[in-house]
């Protein structure tokens, strides 16, 4: 297997949509990914589009600030609004990469699934990453299928892959949805992210 990375185009800003179930570690993953890309000479902006959890934006801002990463947020209940205005803001302020942190949602919640579909349409992402906790069980495979149906994501980001977990179900997800694992979270720390090398 070859390692699958994000293939950046000249598009400004390059948009990465991050989605997943509740509790999969999306917000932390967005900051880790931003930090990773910043070290790769990109200029990322995170859009705070997780409006379901009251503390989500605060958590995102605290984590991002420590890494000196910019966050765009708004006083609104509409993530679509955040996304369209955030991309506009990125354009005006020469950010070359936008990372959208979306609310964790259950695949059986049709309202929220339709919402992420709409976020996808509005943001026209160049890359859609599905975040999966490596400790998940079999039901996660069904969830991944559903997300893929709605979003047709381009890659998987495995979180909490430290210590003993070999990411059994998560690896099954890869073959079931036929999408590459692009990044793995290797520790709780903000530099705990790596491009996935299938042969390791």
Question: Which residues are covered by each model-predicted region?
Answer:
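Phosphate-centric recognition/catalysis
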Residues: 159
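Nucleotide-state-sensitive switch-loop elements of NTP-binding domains
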Residues: 1-19, 24, 28-131, 135-143, ...
């Amino acid at each position: 297997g070859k390692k699958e990375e994000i293939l950046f185009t000249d598009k400004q800003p390059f948009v990465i949509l991050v989605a997943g179930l509740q509790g999969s570690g999306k917000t932390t993953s967005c900051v880790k990914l931003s930090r990773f890309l910043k070290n790769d000479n990109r200029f990322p902006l995170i859009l705070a589009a997780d409006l379901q959890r009251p503390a989500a934006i605060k958590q995102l801002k605290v984590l991002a600030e420590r890494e000196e990463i910019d966050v765009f947020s708004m006083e609104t209940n509409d993530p679509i609004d955040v996304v369209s205005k955030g991309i506009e803001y990125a354009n005006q302020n020469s950010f070359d990469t936008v990372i959208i942190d979306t609310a964790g949602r259950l695949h059986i919640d049709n309202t929220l699934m339709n919402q992420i579909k709409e976020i996808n349409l509005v943001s026209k992402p160049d890359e859609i990453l599905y975040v999966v906790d490596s400790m998940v069980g079999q039901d996660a495979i069904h969830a991944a299928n559903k997300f893929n149906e709605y979003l047709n994501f381009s890659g998987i980001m495995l979180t909490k892959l430290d210590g003993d977990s070999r990411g059994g179900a998560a690896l099954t997800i890869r073959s079931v949805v036929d999408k590459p694992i692009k990044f793995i979270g290797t520790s709780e720390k903000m530099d705990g992210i790596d491009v996935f090398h299938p042969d390791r």
